[in-house]
């Protein structure tokens, strides 16, 4: 590849710097194996930025992200900053403004049960044995969380609260295309989640998704009501490939998908805008209780790097190489402490070294 790429690395707080270090080790292996020209710059964010710059999202960090092709984000937050006003705390003061600034409208959350980790799945053993590999595609900027009017009024028995579910055609079209394009890189199936038997917004959602599906004749489309989808995820998650969801339904289903994998330390996420620019981060938190102990699981951060390569740099071969390396490590029984269950565990650094080596070797 001849193009030059630049990644803004925002390690953040807690275990963020430790797991970011491992992801950048793997990036070095990718660079060398695939002859990719990728540079990185580090910027403070979250609590680290509060300590060093007096605010959770300094202008220099935003400017650095603007100059990058993608952002690799660690994690933010911790008890040290909980005394601050909510808007000045690391989570609300950094991550949400970044999403708004870059107009990140789609959230991608993979949820995969890896071979050898079936015992961590809370589902019945016969269901877990089938495995699953799901991508939840959630619309981030529309729907009931942002629709107007919303508020409270009245008093006594007449006091009421209200929210409004609003979706525009363009919002549904663009998130649907993300889902169908993602399915083309996977197993060619989209299941669109709605409540079209009740909600006008869901009726429009279904109509427009059907229209977009005609542009993707190679991708199978199914529709499912949200209540049935929550049950089917427990009954047989292996039936799903890509789940296409509104903001509210995706908020619910992405967490359900995460829970049935059994380990938050394995779950990456991506938030994208219309230009393909993305912010990539682990789905878990900053875990301040284990920070600095070299025991955190870096796989979610490394998988976030794989998503970055696939979606923002269009380097699917490199992303797949990372995923194969992780599969090999897990198949060989290599575990960090969260997955060891009393067996021998490797450190954060050791897991990063192993995955980077497997990428370099082309396993």
From Swiss-Prot:
One GO biological process term: L-leucine biosynthetic process
Q: Which GO terms describe its cellular component?
A: cytosol
> Which InterPro entries does the annotation name?
IsoCit/isopropylmalate_DH_CS, IsoPropMal-DH-like_dom, Isopropylmalate_DH
What positions does the entry give for NAD(+) binding? 78-91, 285-297
Identify one Pfam family in the record: Iso_dh
- Keyword terms, alphabetized: Amino-acid biosynthesis, Branched-chain amino acid biosynthesis, Cytoplasm, Leucine biosynthesis, Magnesium, Manganese, Metal-binding, NAD, Oxidoreductase
Functional pathway: Amino-acid biosynthesis; L-leucine biosynthesis; L-leucine from 3-methyl-2-oxobutanoate: step 3/4
EC number(s) given by UniProt = 1.1.1.85
Q: List the disulfide bonds.
A: none
Function, in words: Catalyzes the oxidation of 3-carboxy-2-hydroxy-4-methylpentanoate (3-isopropylmalate) to 3-carboxy-4-methyl-2-oxopentanoate. The product decarboxylates to 4-methyl-2 oxopentanoate.
Which protein family is it in?
A: Belongs to the isocitrate and isopropylmalate dehydrogenases family. LeuB type 1 subfamily.
This chain belongs to the protein called 3-isopropylmalate dehydrogenase
Question: What organism is this sequence from?
Answer: Shigella dysenteriae serotype 1 (strain Sd197)
Q: What is the lineage of its organism?
A: Bacteria, Pseudomonadati, Pseudomonadota, Gammaproteobacteria, Enterobacterales
């Amino acid at each position: 590849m001849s193009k030059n790429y630049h990644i803004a690395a925002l390690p953040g707080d807690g275990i963020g710097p430790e797991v970011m270090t491992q992801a950048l080790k793997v990036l070095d292996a990718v660079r060398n194996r695939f002859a990719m020209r990728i540079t990185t710059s580090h910027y403070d964010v979250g609590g680290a930025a509060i300590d060093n710059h007096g605010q959770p999202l300094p202008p220099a960090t935003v400017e650095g992200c603007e100059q990058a092709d993608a952002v690799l984000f660690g994690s933010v937050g911790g008890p040290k900053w909980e005394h601050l006003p909510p808007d000045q705390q690391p989570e609300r003061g950094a991550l949400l403004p970044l999403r708004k600034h870059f107009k990140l409208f789609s959230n991608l959350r993979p949820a995969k049960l890896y071979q050898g980790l079936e015992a961590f799945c809370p589902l019945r053993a016969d269901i877990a044995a089938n495995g699953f590999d799901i991508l939840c595609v959630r619309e981030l900027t529309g729907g009931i969380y942002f629709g107007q009017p919303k508020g409270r009024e009245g008093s006594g028995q007449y006091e009421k609260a209200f929210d409004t579910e609003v979706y525009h055609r363009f919002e549904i079209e663009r998130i649907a295309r993300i889902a169908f394009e993602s399915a083309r890189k996977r197993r060619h199936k989209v299941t669109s989640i709605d409540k079209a038997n009740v909600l006008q917004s869901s009726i429009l959602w279904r109509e427009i998704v059907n229209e977009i599906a005609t542009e993707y004749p190679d991708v199978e489309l199914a529709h499912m009501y949200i209540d049935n989808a929550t049950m089917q995820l427990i009954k047989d998650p292996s039936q799903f490939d890509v789940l296409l969801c509104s903001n509210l339904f995706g908020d619910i289903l992405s967490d359900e998908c995460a829970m049935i994998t059994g380990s938050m330390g394995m779950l990456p996420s991506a938030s994208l805008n219309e230009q393909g620019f993305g912010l990539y981060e682990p789905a878990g938190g900053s875990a301040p209780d284990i920070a600095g102990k070299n025991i955190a699981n870096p796989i979610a951060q490394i998988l976030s790097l794989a998503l970055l390569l696939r979606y923002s740099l269009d380097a699917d071969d490199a992303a797949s190489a990372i995923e194969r390396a992780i599969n090999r490590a897990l198949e060989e029984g290599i575990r960090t402490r969260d997955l060891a269950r009393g067996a021998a565990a490797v450190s954060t650094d050791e897991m990063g070294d192993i995955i980077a080596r497997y990428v370099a070797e082309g396993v």
